[in-house]
Amino acid sequence: MVSANQTASVTEFILLGLSAHPKLEKTFFVLILLMYLVILLGNGVLILMTVSNSHLHMPMYFFLGNLSFLDICYTTSSVPLILDSFLTPRKTISFSACAVQMFLSFAMGATECVLLSMMAFDRYVAICNPLRYPVVMSKAAYMPIRLPAPG
């Protein structure tokens, strides 16, 4: 009697979602789509305002614009797949698509942590050392620290 070592590789995952309540999927699709459009519109307006208004070319607004861009990237990496899973009858995600989505989520989360720490430093300098703020957070000072962040 020969025992064979049988292994199966995982190629896709089954998304259960709201299988017990299929009528709610269309309602959730509309709600999530509306929230996604509000996110895109709100962050897009903030980015447009910080880029177009020369009075807002300061570190605080620069970081807020980058945070808005990062928020758009973060939601765009996951929401379209969620919306697609509500519409299609086959509710699966491939292993590679899952790995890419996980990587993007971790990368965006890490970038957001770095960006929020830079924003915290900016506000710390503005509140605790207001007279030194123009020197510490000059364009020559904050441009090199923003290079790891996108935008």
UniProtKB/Swiss-Prot annotation:
The chain crosses the membrane at residues 28-48, 62-82, 101-121. InterPro entries: GPCR_Rhodpsn (IPR000276), GPCR_Rhodpsn_7TM (IPR017452), Olfact_rcpt (IPR000725). Odorant receptor. Belongs to the G-protein coupled receptor 1 family. Residues 49-61 are cytoplasmic. Glycans are attached at residue 5. The keyword Transmembrane helix applies. Keywords: Cell membrane, G-protein coupled receptor, Glycoprotein, Membrane, Olfaction, Receptor, Sensory transduction, Transducer, Transmembrane, Transmembrane helix. This is Putative olfactory receptor 13C6. Residues 1-27, 83-100 are extracellular. GO terms for biological process: detection of chemical stimulus involved in sensory perception of smell. It comes from the Eukaryota. It is a multi-pass membrane protein. GO terms for molecular function: G protein-coupled receptor activity; olfactory receptor activity. It is found in: Cell membrane. PANTHER family: OLFACTORY RECEPTOR (PTHR26453). Pfam families: 7tm_4 (PF13853).
